[in-house]
Amino acid sequence: EFLDFIEENVDIVFSNKPELHILFGSKNTEVSTKKLMNIVKCGCVKLGKKGSAVFNNSQSCKIEPKIVAAKDTTGAGDMYAAGFLSAFSKTNDYIISGKIGSALAEEIIQINGAQFKKSEMEKVRSKISKFY
């Protein structure tokens, strides 16, 4: 079964609400998140405009979103994951990682496309540096 595979082989999981509901056969996000917490080291459930829930195997934390004017949501989930993984590899802190992932996703949705231009990188670096 897929859940057995995850438990035996996966440390960090990223999911959105529909994926989480399918994975556990439940529309209850809180219950499904608690089940996921029991089988992986850490991860997050992306909640779109409502932010995200990040967790380790014993605690969870809601990451509130900053409301921004979205131009293009392409790449937001990937940018969140990249920020989370980069921060987690440096800090081993799932809350800081979720905040950085969220900050990067907030920045990428304010521009067209899924990649920052060189001219935008200083603003992005400055924004995430406050979390370290």
Feature-to-residue mapping (PLM):
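Conserved phosphate-binding/catalytic region of the ribokinase-like
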Residues: 28-132
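Conserved beta-alpha-beta core of the PfkB/ribokinase-like small-molecule kinase fold
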Residues: 1-33, 50-51
